[in-house]
Amino acid sequence: MAFPKKKLRGLVAATITPMTENGEINFPVIGQYVDYLVKEQGVKNIFVNGTTGEGLSLSVSERRQVAEEWVNQGRNKLDQVVIHVGALNVKESQELAQHAAEIGADGIAVIAPFFFKSQNKDALISFLREVAAAAPTLPFYYYHMPSMTGVKIRAEELLDGIQDKIPTFQGLKFTDTDLLDFGQCVDQNHQRQFALLFGVDEQLLSALVMGATGAVGSTYNYLGKKTNQMLEAFEQKDLASALSYQFRIQRFINYVIKLGFGVSQTKAIMTLVSGIPMGPPRLPLQKATQEFTAKAEAKLKSLDFLSSPSVKEGKPLASA
C-alpha cells in the first residue's frame, strides 16, 4: 500500500474496543460504530488499539482481530485507519506492524516501551526504527505520552533528524500538556512535512494556535461534531466562536475529571451518547459506576450535548 495522498489531519477518534459483559470483544457492533462516527460525529479518521482502545490489555491475537474488523468495516467509509502497534517487546510490535500492512491499514503508530525504558533518544529511535521497518509501505507515527510511559525524552528532540533514520516517519501523536515542547515540534516542522496531532482534547484550541495539523482523542467519539465546529470556526478566523466551543467542551471534561475520568468512564459515556453498547473495560480497570454515568448524563444535557432523539431515548442507531 502506497502512502496516502492526503496527510492525516483534522479529527481522529481514538476508538474504544467494545466488549461484552463477560469481557470478550464485541465485534458485531464495530460496523455500527463506524457509521455513528461518520454520520453523527463527522469523524472519518480513527486511531485503533491505543490507550482508549485498551490495546495493551488485549492479546496479540485480539489486537489483530480488532484491527482487521475496523479496517474491513471502515472500507469506503473512513478516510484513514491508523493502527497502534506499540508493545513492550519489539517482536510483538513488528508482528502487529506487518499485520497492519497486510490488512490494508493506512498507517501505524508506536508508543515508547514503558517497563524496560529507552534511556535516550538514540535508544528509542532504534526501537522505533525496527518496528517501522516491519511495515515499510506504511506511514509511521510516534505516540508521545510521557505521563503513561514515564519516558521523558522530549518530542522536539526526537523529531530532530528522525526521517533520516526512519524514512517512513510521517508524524506525531502528542499526548502531553507541555506546549513548549509541542511548539518546538511545530517550529521544526516549518515545511509542514509531518502531521502533528495533538492528544489533549481540552487544550486543542491552544495547540491549533501553535500549528497543530489535527488531533487524536477519546472525546471525538461523542463530541466530534462540537469539536469539528470549533475547528471550522478557527479556520474561518472566528476566534470568539472557537473559544466558545472550547470552553463548553472544557466544562464537560473538567466536570468528569473531578468525578474520576478514564477509559472506563469513556466507555460509559460513549454507550450513553451513541446508544451502542461499549461494555465494561478489561481488568485491571473497573466498570464506571452508575452514579458517574448519571452525573455525566446530567452534565451533557445541561450543555446541550445530548441532542439526538435516538440518543436521548437510549435507542441504538440502525446499522447500515
Swiss-Prot record:
**Active site (record annotation):** Y143, K173
Instruction: Report which reactions are catalysed by this protein.
Output: aceneuramate = aldehydo-N-acetyl-D-mannosamine + pyruvate
Please state the Enzyme Commission number of this protein.
Answer: 4.1.3.3
User: Keyword Amino-acid biosynthesis on this protein?
Assistant: no
Q: What are the record's GO terms for cellular component?
A: cytoplasm
MF-aspect GO terms? identical protein binding; N-acetylneuraminate lyase activity
- Subcellular location(s) of the protein: Cytoplasm
Per the UniProt entry, what are the Gene Ontology biological process annotations, in alphabetical order?
N-acetylneuraminate catabolic process
Query: Which residues make up the binding site for aceneuramate?
Result: T51, T52, T175, G199, D201, E202, S218
Pathway, per Swiss-Prot/TrEMBL? Amino-sugar metabolism; N-acetylneuraminate degradation
Keywords on record: Carbohydrate metabolism, Cytoplasm, Lyase, Phosphoprotein, Schiff base
InterPro entries found in the cross-reference section? Aldolase_TIM, DapA-like
UniProt cross-references to Pfam families, sorted A to Z = DHDPS
Domain of life (superkingdom)? Eukaryota
- UniProt keyword Lyase present: yes
Instruction: Give all Phosphoserine modified positions.
Output: S308
Which family does the entry's similarity section mention? Answer: Belongs to the DapA family. NanA subfamily.
Described by its record, this protein's role is as follows:
Catalyzes the cleavage of N-acetylneuraminic acid (sialic acid) to form pyruvate and N-acetylmannosamine via a Schiff base intermediate. It prevents sialic acids from being recycled and returning to the cell surface. Involved in the N-glycolylneuraminic acid (Neu5Gc) degradation pathway.
Q: How does it assemble?
A: Homotetramer.
Tell me what this protein is called: N-acetylneuraminate lyase
Q: Which organism is it from?
A: Mus musculus (Mouse)
